[in-house]
């Protein structure tokens, strides 16, 4: 997993509340368990004018000109600004996979669905909770200023605007450690590989009949 320390990123606004995981990545794309390749189908039903299907050439599909993420000014955005209860619905981990593959490393909202919130950390995305009033002001600034960037500093737990305002956010210390060091569940396990091997050796010596290799 790629470490997250500091991000100076273009912000894209998605001014919708209660965006569920089926909107983030529709159910027909859930057959694959590979983490990569979902980006072109993120927000598929809002992003395109036709019905998306696995294996379809997205480069030839008609784009929805009214969907903000299709606006030229937001191409290359790495920070998503959205409304409350983002990521509600089913617990599919494909949702953060799709957002990460699209290019988002941070999501700012007044609140998130719990399972989606946890899945973001496991996949290298930083979900940031800010007060609704702050999110309102950020929406106004993003829409009024083309090329609007925010600086996200995880170590300091600060979001900084181009005008120099700072907004502090909370994060669990363990999750912060994992993001700063690029540790997913596998990475965390590998940190203890010596202890695991030692335990297995002791276990085999104490109960050899469980390890009959004949």
Swiss-Prot record:
Pathway participation: Amino-acid biosynthesis; L-leucine biosynthesis; L-leucine from 3-methyl-2-oxobutanoate: step 2/4
Matches recorded under SUPFAM superfamilies: LeuD/IlvD-like
Record-level Gene Ontology MF annotations: 3-isopropylmalate dehydratase activity
Any GO BP annotation: L-leucine biosynthetic process
Entry keyword DNA-binding: no
CDD domains reported for this sequence: IPMI_Swivel
GO cellular component, one term: 3-isopropylmalate dehydratase complex
EC number(s) per entry: 4.2.1.33
Keywords carried by this UniProt record: Amino-acid biosynthesis, Branched-chain amino acid biosynthesis, Leucine biosynthesis, Lyase
A Pfam family of this chain: Aconitase_C
Catalytic activity line of the entry: (2R,3S)-3-isopropylmalate = (2S)-2-isopropylmalate
Family membership noted in the UniProt record: Belongs to the LeuD family. LeuD type 1 subfamily.
Biological role: Catalyzes the isomerization between 2-isopropylmalate and 3-isopropylmalate, via the formation of 2-isopropylmaleate.
Subunit and partners: Heterodimer of LeuC and LeuD.
Protein name (record): 3-isopropylmalate dehydratase small subunit
Organism of origin: Methylobacillus flagellatus (strain ATCC 51484 / DSM 6875 / VKM B-1610 / KT)
Gene designation: leuD
């Amino acid at each position: 997993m790629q470490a997250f320390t500091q991000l100076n990123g273009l912000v894209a606004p998605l001014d919708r509340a209660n965006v569920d995981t089926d909107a983030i990545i529709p159910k027909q794309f859930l057959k694959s368990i590979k983490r990569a390749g979902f980006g072109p189908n993120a927000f598929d039903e809002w992003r395109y004018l036709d019905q998306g299907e696995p294996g379809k050439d997205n480069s030839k599909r008609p784009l929805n000109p009214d969907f903000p993420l299709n606006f030229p000014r937001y191409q290359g955005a790495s920070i998503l600004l959205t409304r409350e209860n983002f990521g509600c619905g089913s617990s599919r981990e494909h949702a953060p996979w799709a957002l990460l593959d699209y290019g988002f490393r941070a999501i700012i909202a007044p609140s998130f669905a719990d399972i989606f919130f946890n899945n973001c950390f496991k996949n290298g995305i930083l979900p940031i909770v800010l007060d609704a009033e702050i999110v309102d002001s950020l929406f106004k600034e993003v829409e009024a200023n083309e090329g609007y960037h925010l600086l996200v500093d995880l170590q300091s737990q600060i979001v900084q605007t181009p005008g120099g305002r700072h907004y502090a956010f909370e994060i669990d210390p363990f999750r912060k450690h994992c993001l700063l060091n690029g540790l997913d569940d596998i990475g965390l396990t590998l940190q203890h590989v010596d202890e695991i091997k030692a335990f297995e050796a002791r276990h085999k010596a104490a109960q050899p009949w469980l390890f009959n290799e004949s």
